Amino acid sequence: MLELQWRNDQEQAWSQWDFTFVMQGWRTGNMTFEGKAADEVAQGTYGFLNPRKSLYDAFVKAEGKNGYRLQKTLLNSDQMTAYGVKLNPGQNIYGCEGYLFFKNRILKSDNIMDASFFQALQYTDRKIMRYAEVLLLAAEANLEAGNPDVALKDINEIRLRAKETPLTSVTLNDIKTEKRLELCLESTRFQDLVRWGDAKNALASQGKEIPNYSSKGVSWDFTNSTFGFQDKHMLLPIPLKERELNPNIQQNTGW
């Protein structure tokens, strides 16, 4: 959903990095790491882009609270504690409901260079697109083209890898659910909701209340007056630079 993720400023090497990557990960400076977590997880990153309870609930509904894919994707606070991660007393993670993504944790073994001396950074490769996304796109295309058997094969290849029971038939709703779970935090959800025509309902209250997670639990400290998906969000705004270069380009409605 973020348009400006990369600054290509050749004169400032500091500017040539991905803003989204900085926001991902855990707020490790506010945490204590013990045991397995201390051995595996690199320090750094800011702790934004955390999963909502609604995503956790969707996983539980689809595969149970002990689902293999759920355990590899996100953890609740009790599971984080069992892994060896504790939020320090007096610290908090803004925009968090007590769930953290596990799939994007930065492992020491993946680090090109340890940059834990500065909280924002870690040097590790990011996945831009996975084979699972290709399969899900193919499944949707085949289903809409009248090839449900091929679509079923595509989606079950993902489910088998995730140790889920294969489906015996497939619908568009099956593909929507599978894509939400398999590709969460991989920059596909917003665009999918828009093109499916589901965004207005699915994102109706998005951004209304902002959670804050601390060692005392979850509190709701702020409520926005403007929130949710609006008609203008069907299209992204046209950048000012493009409109300056071509005055004939009109800004999209609402922006």
Enumerate the language-model features and the residues they cover.
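A short linear-motif detector with a strong N-terminal bias
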Residues: 47-50, 114, 121, 170-172
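Small/flexible residues
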Residues: 29, 54, 71, 105-110, ...
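A generic alpha-helix propensity feature with a strong bias for hydrophobic helices
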Residues: 54, 92, 132, 240-242, ...
